[in-house]
Amino acid sequence: MALQLGRLSSGPCWLVARGGCGGPRAWSQCGGGGLRAWSQRSAAGRVCRPPGPAGTEQSRGLGHGSTSRGGPWVGTGLAAALAGLVGLATAAFGHVQRAEMLPKTSGTRATSLGRPEEEEDELAHRCSSFMAPPVTDLGELRRRPGDMKTKMELLILETQAQVCQALAQVDGGANFSVDRWERKEGGGGISCVLQDGCVFEKAGVSISVVHGNLSEEAAKQMRSRGKVLKTKDGKLPFCAMGVSSVIHPKNPHAPTIHFNYRYFEVEEADGNKQWWFGGGCDLTPTYLNQEDAVHFHRTLKEACDQHGPDLYPKFKKWCDDYFFIAHRGERRGIGGIFFDDLDSPSKEEVFRFVQSCARAVVPSYIPLVKKHCDDSFTPQEKLWQQLRRGRYVEFNLLYDRGTKFGLFTPGSRIESILMSLPLTARWEYMHSPSENSKEAEILEVLRHPRDWVR
């Protein structure tokens, strides 16, 4: 049974309409007073969303480490696969060593785990703002607060909650289905999907945290990307986690957005750990609105510029190159940013960059939906939207490496992988827009990408 969340008001809180995913009892197993109390509330309990974005820190420039090879066509993939994959190779991999924690010497009473009670309550309170409890046991997260695995899981859960809150506030009558799933090989995920809302035809925001041993096929693919991986008895422990989303509005004047941010770690036979981050965010409008394009790209550029002036132009070009529908000679949309295999200058600095990008999703996109969700449109414009969505489907099924690998990987969670597809799409034989029309205008941009900000 899925958990249905109904909007309480324009504020950041929700009503739990009915239990799901095993019911409240399953939630209480995550531990922690905050979650336990949450699980014991009635069906009309209040579940609050996370606070707004925090400030970001300045950082040195980011880049690819010595293991990365090639350009935008090498080692991409994973957006859809990571969101639902269950053994996936395209989605990055690793095993994170558990960090030991020392109790603080203040007068604060410590728990049996050696953590101050206030810090335990803070983590439980933070988790209570998510769409569902973390995939990883709360006690495990407490034992390794400084570990990147913990930081990234909390970031993707926060991102999921913030985006879902923003979408529901815009939609007005939105009900998110919250589907918590488990992977028998290790880990699981949370898929939040809204369908047939007032504003959004389909909006999916999924997170996954999976771990286990990398399959030989996955290891082979990673070696083809330049990764040097030494196995022990043919095994490579891995961990992969990320957030992935595609949002399709009903109005043809409101654009579609896609984003995903992910972290991978792999442990080799000698104990050496390889890690890297990947992700991106891109916009696919049905009709070109230059003001919207500038706003979207400027917001992403501002997030990138906090960590180096060279990042946005590099990742913008990478995005244009990756989201290319070769048989059509068109890009899927007007781009954004895209990157993979980021593993320098340090884990913390790359994480802060990814954090800045994730926190830019809502301000880059929600104003555009609010601006256009009530625009009038003609049947011809709706028809063009359906044709453009056909192109979206073509790219996802034919070119996106994460989707393709997920579909052919045993144990994959197909529903999560195909979550990115729109509810409706259309194909017409030999369709061609009129010359100098609004439809021809967007095609020109898709065939010849522009620089929207400098």
Swiss-Prot record:
Point out the transit peptide region. Answer: 1-110
- Indicate the principal place this protein occupies in or around the cell: mitochondrion
Sites annotated Important for dimerization:
327
Places the protein is found: Mitochondrion intermembrane space
Q: Tell me yes or no: is Transcription among this UniProt entry's keywords.
A: no
- Quote the EC number: 1.3.3.3
Which BP terms from GO are recorded? heme A biosynthetic process; heme B biosynthetic process; heme biosynthetic process; heme O biosynthetic process; protoporphyrinogen IX biosynthetic process; response to arsenic-containing substance; response to insecticide; response to iron ion
Q: Where is this region: Important for dimerization?
A: 193-202, 392-428
Q: Where is this region: Disordered?
A: 43-70
> Catalytic positions?
258 (proton donor)
Q: Which disease is it linked to?
A: Hereditary coproporphyria: A form of porphyria. Porphyrias are inherited defects in the biosynthesis of heme, resulting in the accumulation and increased excretion of porphyrins or porphyrin precursors. They are classified as erythropoietic or hepatic, depending on whether the enzyme deficiency occurs in red blood cells or in the liver. Hereditary coproporphyria is an acute hepatic porphyria characterized by skin photosensitivity, attacks of abdominal pain, neurological disturbances, and psychiatric symptoms. Harderoporphyria: An autosomal recessive form of porphyria. Porphyrias are inherited defects in the biosynthesis of heme, resulting in the accumulation and increased excretion of porphyrins or porphyrin precursors. HARPO is a rare erythropoietic variant form characterized by neonatal hemolytic anemia, sometimes accompanied by skin lesions, and massive excretion of harderoporphyrin in feces.
Q: Which family does it belong to?
A: Belongs to the aerobic coproporphyrinogen-III oxidase family.
Say what the protein does: Catalyzes the aerobic oxidative decarboxylation of propionate groups of rings A and B of coproporphyrinogen-III to yield the vinyl groups in protoporphyrinogen-IX and participates to the sixth step in the heme biosynthetic pathway.
Q: What is this protein called?
A: Oxygen-dependent coproporphyrinogen-III oxidase, mitochondrial
